Structures are given as C-alpha cells and as structure tokens.
UniProtKB/Swiss-Prot annotation:
This is Transcriptional repressor NrdR. GO terms for molecular function: ATP binding; DNA binding; zinc ion binding. Residues 49-139 form the ATP-cone domain. Binds 1 zinc ion. The lineage of its organism: Bacteria, Thermotogati, Thermotogota, Thermotogae, Thermotogales.
Length: 153
C-alpha cells in the first residue's frame, strides 16, 4: 500500500486485527521511507444499501455519514476513533444481517442511538437532540430522566 504522507509504494504491516466478527481487518502500517505510521481498514463489499430519507428520497448508504455524526456526538469525550469505527461496524453489520437493500433513515438513527446509549450517555443526549430535533430544554430533561429511570445514570 502506498504511504499517504510521502507516496512511497511499499509500506509494511505492523499489526493486523479482525473487526466486526471477521467482517473487516484493521491494519497498522509503517512507511520505511518516511517512518510515518497510519491505519487502514479492509472490508468486503455487500450489495448496495439504499437509504430512504424522511421525504421519500433515496440515496446510497454512506458509512462515513454515521461516523461523522458520531464524531460530533463524541466531541471532547473519552473515546477513540477506532471505538467509533467499531460502533459503525456494528450498525452496518445489523443492517446487512437484516437482508434488506432499502433501509429507512429512521432505522439507522435508532441503531445509532442504541449504540450510543450503551457507550456514553452524554454522546447519546447530544445525538438525540439533533436526531429528534429538540426545540425546548424540557426535551433534554425528558431524555435524561429516561436514562436515570433505566439506571444508566
């Protein structure tokens, strides 16, 4: 694989790990030319998933959109990008296991919320505020009460 920093064509693999129940491989690489280290991910492709938006539009599924949402939700929170990648892998795995090629955006949002709820309550509330389009402070309080009632706080 080519080094993204200097363009040298023969990098070496330092470490490989399976992710997502064997559906992906994370490789830590080093360039012998500039000594930069970087991470690559290898995943197999399945049939294309189409997302049905709330207004009825259809668009190609893009895992980067989920990752970008997680990056915002986890901003200044103690979680690594690798952990976020695992969350995205879990969500994609659930979508693929469903066997359907058309998925409503609401389902993706719910899956993200379920994963966030398990990992970080602050990120969960942040994501919920955007996903559920909170307009009033009472909506934040209600979500926090739900977490408290379920013993998650």
């Amino acid at each position: 694989m080519r080094c993204p920093f200097c363009g040298y064509e023969d990098t070496r693999v330092l470490d490989s790990r399976e992710l997502s129940e064997g559906r992906a491989i994370r490789r830590r690489r080093e360039c012998p030319q500039c000594h930069a280290r970087f991470t690559t991910y290898e995943r197999y492709e399945t049939g294309p998933i189409t997302v049905i938006k709330k207004d009825g539009r259809r668009e190609k599924f893009d895992r980067k959109k989920i990752l970008n949402g997680l990056l915002k939700a986890f901003e200044k929170r103690p979680i690594t990008v690798d952990d976020m990648e695992r969350i995205v892998d879990n969500i994609v795995s659930q979508l693929q296991k469903s066997g359907t090629l058309e998925v409503p955006s609401e389902l993706i949002g719910k899956l993200v919320m379920e994963e966030l709820r398990k990992v970080d309550q602050v990120a969960y509330v942040r994501f919920a505020s955007v996903y559920k389009d909170f307009r009033e402070i009472d909506q934040f309080i209600e979500v926090i009460k739900e977490l408290r009632n379920e013993g998650q706080i």
